[in-house]
Amino acid sequence: MRRPPPLGPTTASGPEGNVRNLRKRQAPGPGAAGGCGPEAGGRGENRQKRRMVARATPGRGEVKSDKSVAASGAGKAARRRVEGRRGQVSPSDRRGLEAAKEAEFPLQTERHTKEKRKVTEASSDDPQPGFDLVRKESLTSSESFQTVECLRSLGKEGIVEGIKRRIRNKKLKSLENPPLKITENEATQNIKVEFQDELYKNTLKYSCNILSPEVENNFVFKLRDCNCFPHSKDCNDENNLPYEPDGGCMHVAENFSKKENFRSLAEKSDTNNIPQLLQTEENVMGVNKLLPEESDLYQSKINGLLPCLQREKNKYSIEESSVGRKPRKRMKLSEKADETVTQMNFSNEYNKSELMLQENQMIADGKEAEAKSPLNVLRKVSHNTVSLMDHLLSVPEMVEKETSSEHHVNAVFQKTIEPLLKEETENASEPLGYENMALKEDFKSKSCIGKSPEYHIERRSSREDLRSDSEELKLSCQRTIPMTGKRTWPYYSCARISAWCWKKASLPESSYFLPGSQKSCKKVDVPKHQTNKTHLTDSKLLLQSSLTETNTESSSKEKLDSNLNCLFSVSAVEHTLMVIKEPIIKDDKKIKSEELSRSGSEVISNTTEDTQLTSDTQSLTGNKKRDRGNLTKLNLTAASKDGQEANNSTGKTIHRKACVAKQTFVVPDLVKILNTGRLTNFKIPLLKNKTKKRKEVNAKSSEREGYSPLELLDNLSGADTRQNRSKENVSMTMLGPQTLSIQNSVTPVQASSDSFYNKNSCSISPSFTKHGNSSKPSNHFSEPGNIVSNKEVASLTVENNAFSCDPGYVEKSPSFCCNKQETFRPVSSEVRGRKITKNFSEVGFPDILKAYEDDVLLIDVIQDDPDLFGVSNEGELSFTSEVPRISQEPNVPGEHQSTDSKYVETPVKKEPSDDLRELPVLDCGPIKPDICASNSAASEIKHDPKDANTSLGEVANETSENETLGDFSEQIKGSDLDEKHRFTDKVITKEEKENIYEVRKSKDSRNADIMVGECQFAAPVPKPLCLLVPPLNLSGHQEDTILNTWMNDFRFLGKHSVLKLQNPETCEIFKREKNVGVFQKSLGLMIPYKYCKFHFNTLRGCERPLCKFAHVPEQGDEKVCMDVFKKYININELCLLQRAVNVFMEYYRKFPPGIYFDLQVLNDLLNSLLKHCLLKEVFQIVNLSIMVKMLPSLKILLNIFEHVATMKLRNAVPALIDIFCKLVEAGMVLDPEHFNYIVKLLYQVQASKQEITAVLEMKSRLQMRQFKKNWKCDLDSALNKLEHCKEKGDWTKLGKLYINVKMGCEKFADFQTFCACIAETLTKNCEDERPDTPFCEFAETVSKDPQNSKVDKGVLGRIGISAMYFYHKLLQWSKGRKVLDKLYELKIHFASLKGLIGPEKLASRCQIVNVAAEIFLKSGSLDGALWVMRESEWIIDTPLWPCDRLDVLNRHNLLCTIAHETLAKSLYRQTFEVLQNLPGFQNSQETVEVSQYSLLFNKLLGSCIESNSLGMSSSVAEFMISKSIPIDFSFLRRLITSLGRSRLWLKARAHYKSALSLGCYPPLEGNLYRKLLLIPSYLSEIEMLLAIEIFMVSNASSIQSPGTSTQILQIVLKRCEDNQSRSNDDYQAAVERLIMAARISDPKLFVKHMTVNVNKEQVYSLEHCSALKWLKENMKWAGKVWLFSNH
């Protein structure tokens, strides 16, 4: 394989060059390099294929993201080559690697500066703790950078021209987009800028030419093979690729130097995708060579850590046997390296962590004997982490944003952590110390800060690399041993090891810091190592805080610190994201960081980090199991070991898990986005072709990753987003405002990560569960937080890396769990899942069921085993102790099922499930969740059927809850404290226990796999599946662990699994049902198919959020309800009784009781509820039973009162009294002693007086009702008594008889008959001699009844009408008057009633009123007659009350009679009222002629005028004029004169005007306008004045116009023709009246006598001045009155 000329160490200046020399001298050992074993050849072929593919697809390199992807792919290819040559690395390769590393540092620096420019969010002032010394020097030395750049560019010349064109295009693009901001020191920034410029130029020139096709192929292969791919992406150095063959070293370099290079070269990698990747590989190789000692030390440390972890595993897990050899090898290596590690603590530690990660990747890829080695496992984990990083990096913008934010966070974190790092360095193991030193140096040097942008760039590239690595990891995460033909998985296998646990841990924390961490990740290409350190520091801080919480601060801190060192090394892969996120997250800040991590950038970085941690954690799990005392420390160490060497600190792992959880929220989205595009190619190959498929997948993944993250986002956002649902993508996008690229990529990544996450969570969960159970489930569950941390950690890790979660490890560290609890937030482990999903989708999957069929390891667990269910090290109740079946029993296959069902019923679990809604896992359906589920299921089974089951169900659920990580502590508390919602020991029935126990004992691995798979499948389902487990009492961490289960078992193969689900949702439901069937024991009910058998026929019920089967019986299936109630009552479990209440309420609210309704079942149900103190449910059922008229027994009512009295439930008394009253009203019969007993109980409860009075009132009413029922309404006997009363004339007794009959008669018809008999008795055969009126006595007796009602009044009124008619007929006016008076007294409105018997029964209302009025008139009561008329509203004939003409005539005569009587009494108003209501005035339809009433009205008018009742006279006149009733003009004139004299001028003028219209006065004709007024001499002065006013107003214009003063207004006092016989005295009086009229006027008018005309009529003139003055003062009103008509 041709590789470009080595750059040589001279390119680097200062300590950088020295470090490189050291690396050269220290040739990577077989552990560092990592032998590929049998797969080496295959990988080589794959690399060649990949080269060909990369050549064929130059378009991918056109995008920056593609470049980064290509770079990562190249890095992977190089690593693969190196791994293939493990132990066969040639000196030239080493030199190439060394040169590549040397060149990589400056490139990274330059890239870092460029990245800083682009990412304004990242601040140069923020210290980057993860930077290496070499990196710092490279940053400070601009010349060395340039030299390295040139060398790299020379190395790039070997690339194919096609690649060159792509690189050039990319380069141009990158050049077009210069860095936006340089945050580092000016000097460093300038150097970086210059270096970048040179790099760009060189890249343009040499990028395509330097690299040979062979190198290109290697690049592609390396992308598949190693996690370096992300780094190579960042570096995009062609030189790195040729030196990539040293996979182990490269991988370490990748983590360390590549990170730097990635940062500095991220942009270059965009322009020079493949060449830069090659350079990255070379740089990595170079770095490995330069730091061979460090790498060796690192590997040895890792080896030491691994053995320790393995020893722990041997103690606590059964898996140790399969991995025993590997731990031993690692122990040897670690022992050898421990001595050197002390010296090289800082750099070596970091390198070692990277080496371990690389080795883990190599192991995953090779899956051979070497793969079995712990170092290989760690390396594999690192690879996986890098792959995740590659994925993250594939989205450049996202990465940049994430990097910037992360960088900032790192700075803050460094500041805060620096003292802690110091302490940790002292307390921690050498690896930890090394990392702490690195962190310190990073904090101290500003150049490190300058490198932080590089670190961010590196992170971008590492993300892309992570993509390719994740694909490889998918292969590598597959069983390491299966490659050898064995079915069992080693401890270090991702499937067995919950490598994802650390991922979860870091994910939560990093999630909190996601925005910043993403940015920092981008910056951390070189600072990745630093970032890892920082992460370790963060983890350390988190661990410390958690230790403080767990009261094991001192000891745990030291252990955690040491462990944290390992974690930090591992976190090197994870980068600053986790570290930064963790420090920020810590406790309260962690939540915020989680939210930030959700933005997507942190998620990405967390995913990478988490993956590494997971791998280490897995390897550590076994050792943790060995020593409980060391469990916490070992677990922490395992976590750190997964991240770095897995030896240092479980506490770190915890922190990382928290960070991972945080990151997971965002990362799943990004992963989902990135993975979405590859989901279509997601296939699961058979195990047999595992190696080949891996290679193919690696080649494909490298090609795929060749695309830039942006391209992936663009291409995948459409299809993947559509497939994986834009919901999660949207959420991730919202979280990712920090970086646009992250936001964009988040959508596809989320989609893909959802499906993958679901799958991964299942697979990881098993491994985690297994380890956790073996190690110490009690620790895992020791605290709600601890328990959660174990499982959640795994699940979180799954989200980020799907390979780096170690459930066992997580469980081992209770302190870690505590920290993790704090750390865990709604971190989207699904983000990790998403990223992993993308990688997995690129890789094929083997036949899961077959693969795991023989590999399943069933562990017989004692339910009361203190190790599994005991108290945590912290001394707190283990989470499992409160919810053993939920957390730990789920660890068993049966437990998983129980967990699955439990989560639904557990409200706390449901709360996490709410968060799960956001998890991509829910959206995993389109991603072939069946495959993921099956893989995860198999993995879980392998790890430990118990743990696997728990992790399967719980992982999915916990993963969902991880979304709710922020609330996981509360959820845990709720689960621990809320017995109702949690399936506590009390709630869990014996049947459940037996089921769980049976499941644990189950040795059928196939069944276990199926169950796990089903659970996993359920998890992928968008809503129901994911929610299946989360509702369990599992804490947020446990939920994360569940997600990790997916990752653990998940295989990174691009092919679909053999189990292809046509409908993922259906398959998931089916499998879930199958699982439930296995785990839950049927209650023995025969439930129709259409109803959910889990809801009705299991103790825990249905856990599906959305169940396609009915949970409430339909109409007609009442028998099913009764059967269910009977069964639930017999079992007498609280949960079942509550479910029975729900079913009862839901069914009988919709449907009435039918023939199958059993009242005894209702009573039994109420009794059972009372026994369980479910008083609220009792009230609900009783109220509903009253509504449906199915009353419970009296005994139940008394029992309720007794319960309330016994429990002193004073607040329940009002509701109970209300129910009691309803029951009595509904027909419940109580004896007096029952009432007395109830009152006694109420006194015991200190009920209020009103409440007791209410009971007593109900007693009286009940007695009356009982009397009614006891009274036999014998009509004959009643009638006999009635006759007896009639004979004796005892009308009072008759009234009592009426009351009794009324109370006892059940038929209203009989009652009416009896009333009619009473009416006849009261009206007939009444002797005239007797003055009394029977009706009055009878009515008096009835009215005295206290229960007298309107009905009684109506009956009395009708009987009174009959009596009235009787007396009217007999002309017995006095008796009739008495009847009417009694009705009036009783306020009975008989006018609207009819009689009971005789003609009055059909009489009209008018007739009844006429009869009554006539009786009053005949009896001399005019007021009575008027009262009757008024009560009847003077109604005569209306449509509602029709009557015949005879009734109308009778009314007319009656009213006229009344009018005469009133008028005779001078009752003018009453008379006028009567006349107004004569027939013909009320209804226009009446045909009565009203003119016939003229005499009556004129008589009334005359009477009024005579009596000087001017008001009434005026009203009568107006009414007559309005109704056109002829009016007597004499009366009208008299009225006008009287009004005028009374100074009532308005009415006088109105009537005068009306009189003119009626012709009362001669017409004025045209004289008015001729200035001549003719006034009859018979007019009164008032009438004359009114005539003069009209005259003046009519001539007002003439009078008021100037020049008309000479005009004369003449008034002629006209003699009447009929007045000729009159004497002259009358005429002379008229003259005087005229003069008086002029004087009456206001102002006065002056009339002058002018002459006498021929007719001897006096002619007068109206003085002009007086008329003008009058008009001025009165013209306004006069004009309106006289000029305008009123009508």
UniProtKB/Swiss-Prot annotation:
It comes from the Eukaryota. Keywords: Cytoplasm, Differentiation, Spermatogenesis. InterPro entries: TOPAZ1 (IPR038952), TOPAZ1_dom (IPR029435). Residues 1-131, 319-339, 596-632, 880-916 are annotated as: Disordered. The gene is TOPAZ1. Residues 80-113, 897-916 have a biased composition (Basic and acidic residues). This is Protein TOPAZ1. GO terms for biological process: cell differentiation; spermatocyte division. It comes from Macaca fascicularis (Crab-eating macaque).
